[in-house]
């Protein structure tokens, strides 16, 4: 860090939350080719909250690796929920894992209460803590491969037999400048 201006000021992390969701899923899934079925219960609240989604549908069976790309490239909340449920059994238990990991990483100004970054009063971080998290996550080869990808075409599924192609919102925004 060359300079730090307000690095410890509390802020709302929004989609930066997905860095923690992704790295925890990568570290806790034994097989990234594991197939996971997205249920109606997983996505019902996301429609109400108008959350950004990658395009997977209820009752669709998707490989974990494709869900990971769906989290980071198009910012898919349904992918976050499916991964959290698979890793921890519930979103709330996954949030507990997120806060435990934040503590281990020394993210003293952070408290997670959302897995996708949807706004909640008790969901906050700091620029310094997000930098710590990103520095940690980028050491993981799978995480780095995902975030460096400008696009990803998923494997075919029972609902999307030709797969879905995701384009990175980060690269899209960079090309708009």
Language-model segment annotations:
Residues 107-108, 119-177:
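Domain-terminus/edge residues, biased toward the C-terminal soluble/receptor-binding domains
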Residues 1-128, 135-141:
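Active-site-adjacent loops and short helices of periplasmic peptidoglycan-processing enzymes
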């Amino acid at each position: 860090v060359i300079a730090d201006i307000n690095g410890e000021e509390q802020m709302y992390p929004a989609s930066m939350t997905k860095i923690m969701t992704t790295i925890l899923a990568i570290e806790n899934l034994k097989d990234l080719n594991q197939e996971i079925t997205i249920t109606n219960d997983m996505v019902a609240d996301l429609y109400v909250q108008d959350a950004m989604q990658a395009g997977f549908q209820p009752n669709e069976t998707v490989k974990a690796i494709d869900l990971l790309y769906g989290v980071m490239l198009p910012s898919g909340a349904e992918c976050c929920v499916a991964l959290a449920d698979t890793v921890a059994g519930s979103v709330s238990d996954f949030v507990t894992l997120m806060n435990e990991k934040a503590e281990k990483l020394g993210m003293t100004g952070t408290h997670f209460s959302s897995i996708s970054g949807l706004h909640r009063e008790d969901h906050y971080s700091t620029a310094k803590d997000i930098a710590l998290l990103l520095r940690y996550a980028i050491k993981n080869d799978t995480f780095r491969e995902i975030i460096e990808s400008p696009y990803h075409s998923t494997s075919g599924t029972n609902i999307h037999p030709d797969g879905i192609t995701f384009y990175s919102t980060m690269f899209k925004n960079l090309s708009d400048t």
